[in-house]
């Protein structure tokens, strides 16, 4: 159980763990590349360790010590048929991107995960991969895990995705790299583009045209050194802590500021928050900066439309900030929250309400009333890492002690979260 006390101030200079999305892809692409890939700044959280485990079961040598990883790549067809099921744990990224890779392989594989993964929709990925020629089955005609995949010769497709999802786009692109001809994906809005950037870093040609990204089949990846920046989704919790605790300021070093992920920065600024980007630079095709965050009086805003895919994971902690903003904050167009580790609309509302916050669910988001005094509460993370951390930030401003049950879920993306919170809280 995580115990959080009310904080007087947040101060210091810190780094957050490596970016989860980039860490997954570095291991996957390193395994498929020819030659050695070294990774520094890897996130040694449960989800990324699941990705390592899956590739080890297919004969790839991977050495991991803390945030340093070495992958001995064997090329696209160097993977071996696993003798056991591939267990992705709690990782939606692992199962969806791996589905695209497995669709290209000349063998059979079964992928499964934990209870949360068993409830998450897979047909959005399976449908286009079937169109390309992969034989894939699962519960309810491939809607749910376990997934049985027999890969083979694939044909490139031009796919119009009904959702802006980096996982869907990435699975199709990865399958497309070994399909005949050109494969393209067009999205309704831009989603995260870590796959495109990292494929280019590994020597793959990727063509972008507006909302469409395309790759030609038959391309090879070349092993290389990768430096993973800090995860902006993890930094978001510390940014929020500074915004809600008066008199606070924090320098967060080496954070990835990929434009497809910086919705949180835009929202903080729109609410009146002070956040400066220092020492901006490019590392492995990814933009990186140090963030200087200073406490500010916030005001409520409306968050909707194209920005939602750029901050979907940050909505739980944005809701916490909104409780301390003057006026009302409205979040719309965020139906995707319902199919995360939990139904995050329902979970944010139920847990934040325990503090005495004024928060109302809607079909596609929530309405948060500010400015509200919070009282310490007993919170259940429901096994969702982002809910656990968001409620811990609420605990920093709540009167009395806050207890968070099922806090082990936090290790999925932010090992050492509680220790860091104690270090910067005064």
Swiss-Prot record:
The active site is at residue 313. Catalyzes the transfer of the enolpyruvyl moiety of phosphoenolpyruvate (PEP) to the 5-hydroxyl of shikimate-3-phosphate (S3P) to produce enolpyruvyl shikimate-3-phosphate and inorganic phosphate. It comes from Brevibacillus brevis (strain 47 / JCM 6285 / NBRC 100599). InterPro entries: Enolpyruvate_Tfrase_dom (IPR001986), Enolpyruvate_Tfrase_sf (IPR036968), EPSP_synthase (IPR006264), EPSP_synthase_CS (IPR023193), RNA3'P_cycl/enolpyr_Trfase_a/b (IPR013792). It comes from the Bacteria. GO terms for molecular function: 3-phosphoshikimate 1-carboxyvinyltransferase activity. The lineage of its organism: Bacteria, Bacillati, Bacillota, Bacilli, Bacillales. Keywords: Amino-acid biosynthesis, Aromatic amino acid biosynthesis, Cytoplasm, Transferase. SUPFAM superfamilies: EPT/RTPC-like. Its main location: cytoplasm. One of its GO terms (cellular component) is cytoplasm. This is 3-phosphoshikimate 1-carboxyvinyltransferase. Its EC number is 2.5.1.19. Phosphoenolpyruvate binds at residues 20, 92, 120, 167, 344, 386. Pathway: Metabolic intermediate biosynthesis; chorismate biosynthesis; chorismate from D-erythrose 4-phosphate and phosphoenolpyruvate: step 6/7. NCBIfam families: aroA. It is found in: Cytoplasm. Monomer. CDD domains: EPSP_synthase.
């Amino acid at each position: 159980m995580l115990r959080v006390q009310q904080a007087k101030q947040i101060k210091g200079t810190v780094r957050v763990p490596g970016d989860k999305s980039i860490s997954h892809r570095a291991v996957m692409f390193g395994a498929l590349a020819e030659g050695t890939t070294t990774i520094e700044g890897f996130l040694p959280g449960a989800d990324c360790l699941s990705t390592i485990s899956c590739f080890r079961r297919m004969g790839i040598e991977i050495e991991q010590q803390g945030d340093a990883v070495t992958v001995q790549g064997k090329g696209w067809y160097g993977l071996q048929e696993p003798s056991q099921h591939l267990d992705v744990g709690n990782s939606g990224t692992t199962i969806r991107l791996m589905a695209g890779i497995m669709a290209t392989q000349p063998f059979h594989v079964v992928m499964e995960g934990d209870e949360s993964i068993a409830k998450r929709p897979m047909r959005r990925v399976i449908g286009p991969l079937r169109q390309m020629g992969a034989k894939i089955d699962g519960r309810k005609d491939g809607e749910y895990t376990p997934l049985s995949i027999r890969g083979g010769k694939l044909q490139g497709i031009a796919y119009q995705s009904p959702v802006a999802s980096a996982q869907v786009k990435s699975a199709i692109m990865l399958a497309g790299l070994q399909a005949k001809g050109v494969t393209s994906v067009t999205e309704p809005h831009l989603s995260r583009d870590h796959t495109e950037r990292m494929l280019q870093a590994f020597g793959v040609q990727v063509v972008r045209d507006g909302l469409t990204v395309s790759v030609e089949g038959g391309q090879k990846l070349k092993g290389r050194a990768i430096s993973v920046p800090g995860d902006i989704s993890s930094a978001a919790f510390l940014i929020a802590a500074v915004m809600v605790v008066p008199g606070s300021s924090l320098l967060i070093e080496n954070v990835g500021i990929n434009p497809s992920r910086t919705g949180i920065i835009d929202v903080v600024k729109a609410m009146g928050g002070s956040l400066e980007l220092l020492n901006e630079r490019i590392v492995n095709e990814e933009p990186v900066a140090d963030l200087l965050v200073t406490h500010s009086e916030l005001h409520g805003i409306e968050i909707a439309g194209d920005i939602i895919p750029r901050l979907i994971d940050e909505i739980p902690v944005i809701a916490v900030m909104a409780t301390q903003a003057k006026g009302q904050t409205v979040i719309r167009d965020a139906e995707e929250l319902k199919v995360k580790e939990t139904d995050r609309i329902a979970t944010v509302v139920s847990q934040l309400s325990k503090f005495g916050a004024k928060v109302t669910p809607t079909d596609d988001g929530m309405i948060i009333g500010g400015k509200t005094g919070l009282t310490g509460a007993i919170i259940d993370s429901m096994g969702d890492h982002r809910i656990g951390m968001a409620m811990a930030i609420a605990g920093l401003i709540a009167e009395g002690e806050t207890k968070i049950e099922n806090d082990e879920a936090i290790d999925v993306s932010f090992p050492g979260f509680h220790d860091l919170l104690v270090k910067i809280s005064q």
